[in-house]
């Protein structure tokens, strides 16, 4: 964790937003909040124009409410109906804020159900607090006219429930870096890494045991050293990722790729 120059960590809230106002705003009233990251669909999103304008209106109202009490808002356009896009963006913000040494809270109750699931998983994976804002009523039936001011949920009491933190099994840090590299390659249409590429990857990151590359050896020592590194890759890196179903290892003769 990076120590901030000011000495004290900031308090940051991440709020993925659906058709809600109260559930996004009420928990932060009279609280010390240094910044809010507000995630919602883009104003240019390719969806039904009526639904798009409705969401833009909610986003504007929540932003105005928060800024009126001097809470800065950073807006992030996200494909809210895409679980992976939500996971990616929430995780990116969490990692950046934690790296800066800040305290991060994630509101998982101001968005739709699928989005809420993704948000909660991201918060628990990165070990930050997620919370649920209880509704005292809903803008339906005879209360439907209240939606314009409250959103779909009406919050009066402001009861907040901190979700229990469940530990999510995750790979070692270097293996997460390896997964990230595989993902980058996939996005660039080279969705695999050969064994020598993995050796170079671990060597560049100064991973223990990979300080010396095979080509730095001579004769039989070169071949012996390379086999030892390949065995180390399998034991220390690929077995874990295969066991957790992150990768599939393909053997090609004496070589392999993932």
For the regions a protein language model found, what residue spans apply to each?
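Long, low-complexity, Lys/Arg-enriched
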Residues: 1-103, 117-258
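Short glycine-rich phosphate-binding loop at a beta-alpha junction
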Residues: 103-109
